[in-house]
Amino acid sequence: MEKRIGTFYGVSVGPGNPELMTLQAVRRLENCPVIAAPQTPKGGMLALDIAKGAVELSGKTILPLRFAMSLDPAVQKAAHIEAARAVKEYLDAGQDVAMLNLGDVSVYATFGYLQEILEAEGCKTVMLPGVTSFCAAAARLGQSLTGGMEQPLTIAPGRCAAEVLAAPGAKVLMKSGRQLPETLAALADAGLLSWSAMVCNCGLPNEEVWPDLADYDPARSAGYFATILVKEG
């Protein structure tokens, strides 16, 4: 009899509010025996906390995944390999593993690194889509991301602001918290501060909404999960 190998699922949990999780995500987590979730150096597991607001996870195996915050590609790669190895132990034992991902699993998600490693080793992977932080932020602000059916939309990390602001259409600058002073300076240089809004920690208890970044103090710190929406000027 052929040995069963588990499936590795990338499950999107949305930006913060558990009510934004899809039915597909909830059902997959209900049926998956092993739940893998990123863990910060201080032990925080935000994606797991969000999932617990929608799914009863008691009795399941929780697999913490620790990813390096270093900008060194070699250090990052080593962390991805170690995490993939931990996941594969359960897959080889015939157990499905669901990895929780903030926002949508296809957008700046760590799942993709593990997916590449595990697929190269013959493992089956499945991605379950979800609500992105920038779509939730747009809804929170009550604004459309695209003013018309023909308007382009550019999505980039906040550190790339200076490179993409000249592009036509609206822009989404994700994970902008770390480089916020530089991002605000780029917006100011382009004359787009008043055309820009920011939502920090969208859907979480510590959510902050700034409809006009011209009113934002550049010296004020913003969290890692800061999403900036820039209308076409």
Q: What is each model feature region?
A:
Residues A37, L63-R66, M127, G147, ...:
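Structural signal for conserved beta-strand scaffold positions within catalytic alpha/beta enzyme cores
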Residues M1-P18, L23-K124, P218, G223-T227, ...:
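Class I S-adenosyl-L-methionine
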